[in-house]
């Protein structure tokens, strides 16, 4: 009887990691975007604070702290927080998606798989569908990396950000700021 009980406990413990959640490791993750001004001047920026995870059911939820925008110029960061993102009212952008949890669990350390992930992005009070071409790699027994295979293009007018972009353009005295913004990411998850 003891052998059966120990066997059941051992089976439950071995099964646990496959059912456990994946927690986003913000220190090992990066989300960057490219802005284009004056027609052909491109600059790379990032958000420093990301959080979220993947549930045992495959539900992905990522939160981007918009106040953590980092353009390497503090005045520009402040203007983006106030004039573009309006972080007093909209403090985060949220991404949610559903992935095949079994496919993630089946990956062995060192293996990777390409996925098309359909999700939604909520930004500035607007929610829009989002298609993401990603590579998912099992980097260790309890670590996953999810990387954009192609940039995701976010169009400012779809999220009612065009007026904010125009305000930034005017205050900076620029001839133009692009409304289509390529976004790339590397998300590191630790199994919890």
Feature-to-residue mapping (PLM):
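Positively charged n-region of N-terminal signal peptides that target proteins for export
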Residues: 1-4
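Short amphipathic alpha-helical "recognition" segments used for binding
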Residues: 6-7, 81
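Bacterial N-terminal signal peptides
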Residues: 7-15
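Low-complexity, acidic/polar, glycine-enriched regions of mature
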Residues: 20-192
